[in-house]
């Protein structure tokens, strides 16, 4: 009688070890246990739009983020501020200028250290050349990392995607051919497809700007990004910017009827925070006020926690409260009322106030958790059962 063959076991632990072994050999990332980090934008409400948190949020420090919009909407202004804060956090800046509009003097004016040991500025707008450069640069860092070296923290800025040209586009111009370039979008898509995985492996963020134009073929005309869909697919966060004139009363006849711009930032794609839109201001003389936009959450409902809201002070049994209404804002910790234009100061929005606002704003921008979604489904199912029961109990005479 033949002996029955006993099957050998292959445990989950062995399978996990096999995956680890193959990953080491092929350099494939199987997990990322590092905590998500962010680079401050210097505008609290923009931090929340990008990452939910006003205090510790901002641009993801290991993903692709794109700010897109028409000219003069603050795209470059935003990335200069982000670059400055990245340097403060000890990161090296690789700045790629495709518009030939950035100089070391411009960057210095925004507070950046342009020493070559802290920042490299590259000017090129040919997408194929940039693909080769970035691929070789990232591959060199990967080799160093795989050899056990601790590589510097790097942030790549690309200003802008919309100004990238293809080899064919340039060659057609040299040949005197006035043809539409059908290869440009494909080349840009290749660029992002080639570098995206390496950026993730190295934990390097790319923060880019892009142009937008109106798609008139859509049923309702909408703004879309230049350069095709490649960058859109690769980016984790895409924010569209638009502007209106900012009038402060300081304008003179040479100010083009405005003192700056009111920027509307709309999150078109975000894997971390709910897609929302916020507003902030860029004053040509004073820059941005980082507190602007926080007043939206200073409501009578939040007054007990935050201590700022539009209304008048009330007091009963020694407890300070609020009578909502009016045009002035009552600030509890200062025991004073302010007009809105006086509101946006560190004396009003103290660290204690910001910490009180943090969980309120975080929840507003946060996606629902799995438990919250399940609770909602269960409630809906329960409500359906009650409605069905109520309907069954209706007499036919009640229907007519």
Label for each model-derived stretch:
Residues 89-180, 190:
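Conserved inter-motif catalytic segment of the P-loop NTP-binding fold
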Residues 290-340:
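Long, well-ordered amphipathic alpha-helical subdomains in the mid-to-C-terminal portions
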């Amino acid at each position: 009688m033949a002996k029955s063959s006993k099957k050998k076991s292959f445990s989950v632990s062995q399978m996990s070890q096999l995956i680890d072994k193959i990953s080491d050999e092929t350099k494939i990332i199987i997990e990322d246990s590092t905590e998500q980090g962010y680079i401050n934008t210097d505008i609290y409400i923009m931090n929340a739009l990008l990452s939910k948190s006003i205090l510790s949020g901002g641009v993801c420090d290991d993903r692709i983020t794109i700010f897109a919009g028409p000219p003069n909407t603050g795209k470059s202004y935003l990335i200069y501020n982000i670059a400055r804060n990245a340097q403060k956090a000890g990161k090296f800046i690789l700045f790629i200028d495709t518009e030939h509009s950035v100089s070391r003097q411009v960057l210095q004016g925004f507070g950046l250290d342009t020493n070559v040991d802290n920042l490299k500025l590259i000017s090129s707008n040919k997408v194929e050349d940039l693909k080769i450069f970035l691929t070789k640069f990232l591959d060199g860092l990967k080799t160093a990392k795989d050899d056990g070296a601790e590589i510097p923290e790097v942030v790549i800025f690309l200003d802008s995607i919309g100004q990238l040209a293809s080899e064919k586009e340039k060659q057609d111009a040299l040949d005197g051919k006035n043809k539409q370039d059908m290869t440009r979008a494909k080349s840009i898509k290749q660029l992002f497809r080639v570098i995206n995985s390496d950026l993730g492996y190295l934990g390097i963020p790319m923060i880019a700007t892009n142009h937008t134009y109106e798609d008139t073929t859509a049923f309702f005309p909408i703004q879309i990004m230049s350069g095709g869909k490649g960058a859109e697919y690769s980016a984790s966060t895409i924010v569209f910017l638009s502007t209106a004139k900012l009038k402060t009363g300081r304008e003179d006849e040479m100010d083009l009827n405005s003192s700056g711009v009111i920027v509307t930032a709309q999150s078109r794609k975000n894997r971390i925070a709910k897609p929302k839109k916020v507003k902030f201001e860029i004053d040509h003389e004073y820059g941005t006020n980082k507190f602007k936009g926080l007043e939206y959450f200073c409501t009578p409902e939040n007054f007990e926690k935050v201590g700022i809201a539009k209304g008048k002070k009330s007091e009963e049994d020694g407890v300070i409260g609020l009578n909502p209404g009016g045009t002035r804002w009552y600030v509890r910790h200062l025991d004073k009322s302010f007009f809105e234009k006086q509101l946006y100061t560190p004396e009003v929005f103290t660290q204690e106030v910001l910490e009180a606002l943090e969980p309120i704003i975080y929840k507003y921008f946060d996606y629902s958790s799995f438990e919250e979604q399940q609770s909602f489904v269960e409630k809906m199912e329960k409500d359906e059962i009650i409605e069905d029961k109520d309907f069954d109990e209706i007499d036919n005479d009640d229907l007519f």
